[in-house]
Amino acid sequence: MSYVEQYYESISRLLRQTVDEGEEVLGKAADIMVHAIKEGKSLYLFGASHAGIIAEDAFYRAGGLALFNPIFSPALMLNVEPITLTSKLERLEGYGTILLESKPVKQGDVLFIHSVSGRNPVAIDMAIAAKQKGMTVISLTNVSYSKSVESRHSSGKRLFEVSDLVMDNHGEPGDAAVSVKSLSQKVAPTSTIVGSFIIHSIVLKMIEQLEEAGREVPVFRSANLDGGDAYNEAMMERHKHQIHYM
């Protein structure tokens, strides 16, 4: 089997496992978020470095939910030089709390945090601070990976241990999936593809609930379709009390 075929098999297995074993937790995540929306609360997304790709993928995207508010830090994005700065800052205790407090978060809001290892302070701090503010914390992590490493946070806790709801991407420790002949290190990470599938699956389950309740489904149209800009502007105006990125 070629390396590409091995990767395809790994991704296919993980997606199937997510549906077969994780559909209940997908539904629970959707329940939490829909309840918050109905109560006029806000939804936030966070991830550091490559984990932040999931927040980017779900935010301000054609076919995506308009109510996701990302928490981005320029110092944790992949255009930083030197790139190793992202690793140093996500290990800096207190930084996650500062980032959360830069947003208008309030009791009853929901925070979705993606961290593959779940061991670094930026995600753990943010989760702890969010819970102290009365927010609900949903985490997406690699549970087996996280259990195999020690926390870098002074509490000794990992992300899955400080979250209200834990979602598992079912990946391997180290994230990469394909063994190659010339390396001891595996190649081809799985967390981004699986994470993207998970966040969009949550949105689909949310839409099912919103439709059943007769509520508007605030989803973006492509700005490159005729009428897309006007549609999106009107929708964002209707939901401006839950949108904090404009």
UniProtKB/Swiss-Prot annotation:
Molecular function terms, GO-annotated: carbohydrate derivative binding
GO BP annotation list: carbohydrate derivative metabolic process
Highest taxon listed in the record's lineage: Bacteria
SUPFAM superfamilies linked: SIS domain
InterPro entries attached to this UniProt entry: RpiR-like_SIS, SIS_dom, SIS_dom_sf, SIS_GmhA/DiaA_subfam, UPF0309
Any Pfam family the entry gives: SIS_2
Location of the SIS domain: 33-212
NCBIfam families tied to this protein: PRK02947.1
Recorded family membership: Belongs to the UPF0309 family.
Protein name (database record): UPF0309 protein ABC0887
